[in-house]
Amino acid sequence: MTQKDISSTIKFDKMCVTYYANKLKSCKDRGIEFNLTYTQVKNMLRAKRCQYTGITLTKSQGSLQRPTDVTIERIDSSKPYETGNVCAVSFAANQAMNNMEQWFGRNSINAMKKMTKYVSKHNAKLK
């Protein structure tokens, strides 16, 4: 392993620890159940593409999140963060889904998520 690889691994591990701690605190503050292990979160943060849009995901470089930075989204926001109810998406997609759910309600947003997944899978087949 090169010095650059080691540095990159340490940087990613540090980002994952920070993300996990912040997510735990955020969920506790908002009264949302969080049932994912650190390893599960770390594996999800390795995602290369947004599950909703298919765009290439980036890793957070600081306290401000970029639109393409990876984050973990609950598929059904009425349920906890747990296996089967989470996916890796871009920060922008996560924010858009949250805003649309507030505007249109959960049923509309769940239909939109299904449609987005379908389009993303279809686009992947075309490549």
Q: What are these model-predicted stretches?
A:
Residues E82-N94, K117-K127:
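Short Fe-S-cluster ligation motifs
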